[in-house]
Amino acid sequence: MSRDAAGKSACATGQAAKCRVGLPLAFLCAAALYAQQVPVFRAEVDLVRVLATVRNQAGELVGALQKGDFEVFDNGVRQEISVFERRTELPLSVALLVDTSGSTNKELLYETDSASRFLRALLSEGNPEDAVALYSFNYDVTVQQSFTHNYRSLETRLKALRGDAGTALYDAIFLAARDLEPRPGRKVMVIVTDGGDTASAKDVHAALQAAQLADAVIYPVVVMPITNDAGRNIGGEHALQFMAEGTGGRPFLPSVGAELDRAFGDIITELRTQYLLAFYPHDAPLARDPFHKLEVRVGRPELRVSARNGYYGEVEGGTGTPGARTSIDPEGRKKRQKK
């Protein structure tokens, strides 16, 4: 699918529309096999932007570093940092994904109340160009509200959320990433879920690739159940941690109540303390894989930096079709307008 076609999809409209990804579940594959099957293509890369968060050994955010404290490596080659901003004020586009599967029924009211407070704080304290889109997911994915700065509209949609069967977590990430990709500024996904995926056509690797193509940072908020289940499957938590680390975000595992509010507050603080690093790639060796490995270093051993681990750019060889943009079947989506 072309970028223009994706921009006109149901997931980019102002009305709520239910979208279903049309690939069979047999698409799921192991990580090694997935890496071998990534199509080769060439994409013009100009300025590559990297958002970085730095913490000290106590886990506290560090927001006063200088440009000279950072080093950026593209496929192992050090790059000149052309743009540097502390506490960047680039506009935010936040996709808030809320799990409304049956397993979240007991926690859903607490989650939506806390998410409402999060959105109020985010939109009242930040850039007036900041915008949030709201998605819910159970057996399919619903765009409850397209990108807006209107908190009241988002609050109304949040309070109307109801549960259903199934958890199409990876499909939700994939579709939200597609909607985030054309937007300017910083792009973030905040995912409120209890963990596991049960209904997606996409797998974790396709979801991560879509987020990386969109330059989106993923913050999973994995809500611990009110009644602890010793036998609960934690595979979904590991997958979400994998995606967070691959995009420069970090996972949160709160219980409902004050811990959930604190997790949302920490996300806002982190977003307001990010460094923006940007470079024009040069001398980075081209590879068969379009994925360029990124590494951001800070020249102080007591500090730890979080940033996305790569981006999709030029590859050795000819031109091809960007595979991540051709895998949506428009005829296979379920579309439903909300009254």
Model-identified regions with their sequence ranges:
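Short, low-complexity intrinsically disordered segments enriched in A/P/G/S/L with frequent Arg
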Residues: S2-R3, S9-A12, C19-L25
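Short, low-complexity interaction segments enriched in Ser/Thr/Pro/Gly
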Residues: A5, A12-Q15, E331-R336
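Hydrophobic residues within membrane-embedded alpha helices
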Residues: A6-G7, D46
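Residue-level detector of intrinsically disordered/flexible regions characterized by low predicted structural confidence
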Residues: A10, A17-R20, S200, R336-Q337
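Hydrophobic h-region of N-terminal signal peptides that target proteins for export
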Residues: A26-A35
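Scaffold/interface architecture of coatomer-like assemblies
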Residues: Y34-K339
